[in-house]
Amino acid sequence: MDKVIFMVDMESFFASVERANHPELSGRPLLVSGDPERRSGVILAACPVAKARGVTNGERLWEAQQKCPEAVVVRPHMQQYVTVSVQITEILERFTDLIEPFSIDEQFMDVTHSQRLFGAPREIAQKVQQAIWHETGVRARIGMGESKVLAKMACDNFAKKMPSGVFHLTKERMERLLWPLPIECLYGVGRQMTKYFRNQGIRTIGQLANTSLERIKGKWGVNGHVLWLTAHGIDPSPVTPHSHDKQKGIGHGMTLPHDYVKAEDIHVVLLELCEEVCKRARRAHLMGRTVAIGVSGANMETPTGFHRQMKLTNHTNITMEVYEGAATLFERFWDGKPIRRLHVNLSNLTSDEAWQLSFFGNRDRAHQLGYTMDTIKEKFGDTAIRRAVSFLSASQAEERAKKIGGHYK
């Protein structure tokens, strides 16, 4: 039996969930923006009607409103999106246990052996679409192929543009349908890689596919090899339900509301990020021994900042121990330029069961205190108990507690 893999993608996911929750908005263009009160906020999602007017995700709200002035603008509700995403996963699991989340609104399915129960691939796709629509009010588009990359490209380049929302891209159809497309339509090719390819005279997927592998590997190494295979629809990776289960690191970052220029202000946010990282580590019963921090400025055209890591004395999930390492890195490598984004990561993980008592300090007490604080926050909210520094003007703890994934709950 030929392998059949689906890429199931939700149409304008955030906007679709908002519309399903607010039937009174039916028929009106809808935009989801991080901060509707600020015209400088960015578009997180736009309904198909707004997209047809030229609105794109990531553009400024005021620009979108010029293109679609009658659009209703709503604030995102990330907790609701997460809930619906989980609900959709449960729907997909009725058809196969081989489900691999790709993002909050995209999932791979291997339905190879589901055909005996649910019919041909297109029939299964239609049943999946109907179930998702009836239970969530969200429309799904489904790309089909014998590999994950074929399914992904079938979805992005064809299914999203078809009334049925379903498209099967076989290897036999690649040369006729996929290869004439611009090189940027190839999965894995971003803006920078598009420039590189175009400078080399490679403007279509077919031109890449027909370029010798030796030339591609010689110029772009392993990444070029992978893209050449993708252009041929070759991807041996299976749909793996638990591929994201084992964590290699626990990180947390945030974009600041304005440039931070004072070291004492940056230290406040750095401590709060370490608090969040350690809370997540304790929740997973993990400890880490390598701490890394990354900082950057607001101007992406002329990047500033650094990314450095160091090994700690012990595996830990104690906030102050991780913070001491992060603070050391910051003081050592910060050049004094304004900072707009910070990130803290804890890696080299091991089980919390390996905790070693220290008879010459207060490590065990601090270790238990962390879990006690977590229990209080779980019961009464993240702002129920805070460090004193979180009451300073530089603190972002209270604002961050209102958000999931950087957006309001």
Swiss-Prot record:
Belongs to the DNA polymerase type-Y family. The record marks F14 as: Substrate discrimination. One of its GO terms (biological process) is SOS response. Monomer. Residues 5-190 form the UmuC domain. It comes from the Bacteria. This is DNA polymerase IV 2. Mg(2+) binds at D9, D105. Its EC number is 2.7.7.7. It is an enzyme of class 2 (transferase). Its main location: cytoplasm. PROSITE patterns: UMUC. GO terms for cellular component: cytosol. GO terms for molecular function: damaged DNA binding; DNA-directed DNA polymerase activity; magnesium ion binding. It catalyses: DNA(n) + a 2'-deoxyribonucleoside 5'-triphosphate = DNA(n+1) + diphosphate. HAMAP family: DNApol_IV. The active site is at E106.
